[in-house]
């Protein structure tokens, strides 16, 4: 618990101090956001706002995680160091962040709304996702438990939904596909949500907060631990270190949100949204709560569905629309809601999804107790 407090405190401080310094750097270089003309007219005033703020979040997370383990080692040389699960998750976050950084840089340098084309972006995301999936199935601990498994999970692995039903090789291939679906869905969900000042950052704070609580609980109730509760114990690799990383992510985003809230001094850009989405997907996979992510990240799912419905209905009806504009947050803007009103109400909605997800997580343990 001390490590979580140290890590969160460091991440908050790094993001709070680092973000304004990064803003000054971007302003000097003229790296500002390009705003589409077909978006809400109220957004035109945001043209030129510094972007790529996700760089600060990623840097704060990496620095805080490393420093926390260094401090814990200095306090107690026998304390466990960085875990395989956390390092693999950090790889996914950084890899996706680099894809987003490249996308942002192209937009800024060419002053257009399109960065990487869809095909190139998907290929790069898939490449990072494949490497993550392969790494996650390897590096077993002394008991043979790897960071991830081929079983699809809800609150824990579901033994009757094992992708390795046709053998180890087929299971590994299917896991790579399944893992990439989760990563792609999460990254695109956060990316679509990042359309209003503070919306994606605030919603993500709550999601990472949920994974912090779940990681602590999984550690307390780990199979083989003194506090194990029979059939309700969890077989998760490095749950407490994952909880530390989730707490660091949440705190770093709070620090960034201080500058990203309306009126935003900086945007996270695709650098941030893809890194955050990748991290969220990584937590779901490594904490064995893959299907539960659909509820905990329900706000991202809802916003993504609004785009799918809008595009599908538009094509099916020859130009008609369900919403005034998609993603969903812009629909309410065009209905006359103030941007801050939309953001706060969507935060409330996101918080409710997180609460329901946590309720399901703990209720399942009570049932198995």
Swiss-Prot record:
Keywords: Cell cycle, Cell division, Cell membrane, Cell shape, Cell wall biogenesis/degradation, Magnesium, Membrane, Metal-binding, Peptidoglycan synthesis, Transferase, Transmembrane, Transmembrane helix
Domain of life: Bacteria
Gene Ontology biological process: cell division; cell wall organization; peptidoglycan biosynthetic process; regulation of cell shape
Broad class of where this protein is predominantly found: membrane
EC identifiers of the protein: 2.7.8.13
Compartment(s) where it occurs, according to its Swiss-Prot or TrEMBL record: Cell membrane
One GO CC annotation: plasma membrane
Cofactor dependency: Mg(2+)
GO MF terms held by the record: metal ion binding; phospho-N-acetylmuramoyl-pentapeptide-transferase activity; UDP-N-acetylmuramoyl-L-alanyl-D-glutamyl-meso-2,6-diaminopimelyl-D-alanyl-D-alanine:undecaprenyl-phosphate transferase activity
Pathway in which this enzyme or protein is active: Cell wall biogenesis; peptidoglycan biosynthesis
Reactions it catalyzes: UDP-N-acetyl-alpha-D-muramoyl-L-alanyl-gamma-D-glutamyl-meso-2,6-diaminopimeloyl-D-alanyl-D-alanine + di-trans,octa-cis-undecaprenyl phosphate = di-trans,octa-cis-undecaprenyl diphospho-N-acetyl-alpha-D-muramoyl-L-alanyl-D-glutamyl-meso-2,6-diaminopimeloyl-D-alanyl-D-alanine + UMP
Function field: Catalyzes the initial step of the lipid cycle reactions in the biosynthesis of the cell wall peptidoglycan: transfers peptidoglycan precursor phospho-MurNAc-pentapeptide from UDP-MurNAc-pentapeptide onto the lipid carrier undecaprenyl phosphate, yielding undecaprenyl-pyrophosphoryl-MurNAc-pentapeptide, known as lipid I.
Family: Belongs to the glycosyltransferase 4 family. MraY subfamily.
Name of the protein described by the UniProt record: Phospho-N-acetylmuramoyl-pentapeptide-transferase
Species of origin: Pseudarthrobacter chlorophenolicus (strain ATCC 700700 / DSM 12829 / CIP 107037 / JCM 12360 / KCTC 9906 / NCIMB 13794 / A6)
Organism lineage string: Bacteria, Bacillati, Actinomycetota, Actinomycetes, Micrococcales
Encoding gene, per UniProt annotation: mraY
């Amino acid at each position: 618990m001390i490590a979580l407090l140290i890590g969160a405190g460091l991440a908050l401080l790094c993001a709070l101090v680092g973000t304004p310094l990064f803003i000054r750097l971007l302003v000097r270089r003229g790296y500002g956001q390009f705003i589409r003309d077909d978006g809400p007219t109220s957004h035109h005033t945001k043209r030129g706002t510094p972007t790529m703020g996700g760089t600060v979040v990623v840097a704060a997370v990496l620095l805080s995680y490393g420093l926390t383990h260094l401090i814990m080692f200095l306090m107690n040389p026998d304390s466990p160091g960085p875990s395989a699960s956390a390092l693999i998750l950090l790889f996914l976050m950084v890899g996706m962040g680099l894809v987003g950084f490249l996308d942002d840089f192209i937009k800024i340098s060419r002053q257009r709304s399109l960065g990487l084309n869809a095909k190139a972006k998907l290929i790069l995301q898939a490449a990072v996702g494949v490497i993550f999936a392969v790494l996650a199935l390897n590096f077993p601990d002394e008991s043979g438990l790897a960071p991830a498994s081929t079983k699809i999970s809800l609150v824990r692995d579901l033994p009757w939904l094992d992708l390795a039903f046709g053998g180890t090789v087929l299971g590994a291939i299917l896991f790579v596909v399944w893992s990439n679906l989760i990563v792609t869905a999460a990254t695109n969900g956060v990316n679509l949500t990042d359309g209003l000042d503070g919306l994606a950052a605030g919603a993500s704070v709550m999601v990472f907060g949920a994974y912090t609580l779940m990681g602590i609980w999984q550690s307390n109730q780990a199979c083989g631990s003194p506090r194990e509760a029979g059939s309700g114990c969890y077989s998760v690799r490095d749950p407490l270190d994952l909880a530390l990383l989730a707490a660091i992510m949440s705190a770093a985003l709070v620090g960034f949100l201080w500058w990203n809230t309306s009126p935003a001094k900086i945007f996270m850009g695709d650098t941030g949204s893809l890194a955050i989405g990748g991290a969220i997907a990584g937590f779901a996979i490594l904490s064995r709560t893959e299907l539960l992510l659909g509820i905990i990240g329900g706000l991202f799912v809802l916003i993504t569905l609004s785009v799918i419905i809008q595009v599908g209905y538009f094509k099916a009806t020859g130009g008609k629309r369900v919403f005034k504009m998609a993603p969903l947050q812009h629909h309410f803007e065009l209905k006359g809601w103030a941007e801050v009103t939309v953001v706060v109400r969507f935060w409330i909605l996101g918080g409710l999804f997180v609460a329901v997800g946590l309720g399901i997580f703990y209720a399942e343990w009570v049932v198995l107790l």
